[in-house]
Amino acid sequence: EKFLFYRGVGRFTLPIAATMDAAGQVSIRKQGPGRIDEIILFSNDRGRLRYEVRRAADGLVTVDPPVTDQEPSLELQRMLVANGLYPEEANAMVKTWRDSWLEEGTRLFYVVPRRVIDSVLPLDINPPADDVARVFVARTELVTPAATNEITRALLANDIPALAKYGRFLEAIGRRIVENASEADRMLLEQRLQSAYAAMMTFRDRCAG
């Protein structure tokens, strides 16, 4: 028996919106149908791991879990099983996405409510299956003030290695920095951002080749 997991690109409103302010508080707002029992707040800061399982609710949640140096793999698996996967499936899913889910950064995870999945991606099986479990994990990246400051410094210094660790998120964060920059810095930051992103794409293409 083998498992196949996939991800794709889509554009729709997620049931939870989250933002982080300068004080490190995460504002969580429920904005869609369906029930979400819990979320996992996770942070990887240069290998220092923090995470905490919280009940999903509107309001402010302070992102200051203790440094555990432990991965939330078991908590992720338990959350997947609670939403319909078999233990073997949950274990395989976490192993498949581990490097991406637990890379450096701050993010939250939760399982998208089934009714949201069915409305966005209707599924029709003929003949009908006895049972169907559809478990989609939502990952929301939180841009911390520390990350914004680090990227700003790296852009001004043209420090490509420091920028490269932000991977596919660099352009989105960088655009926000450019938009909020002073007139004096905006053009330089824009040029450095384009240069860094081009260098990263060239490196990726070489590795793929």
Which stretches of residues belong to each language-model region?
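Protease-labile, long low-complexity intrinsically disordered regions enriched in Pro/Ser/Thr
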Residues: 1-209
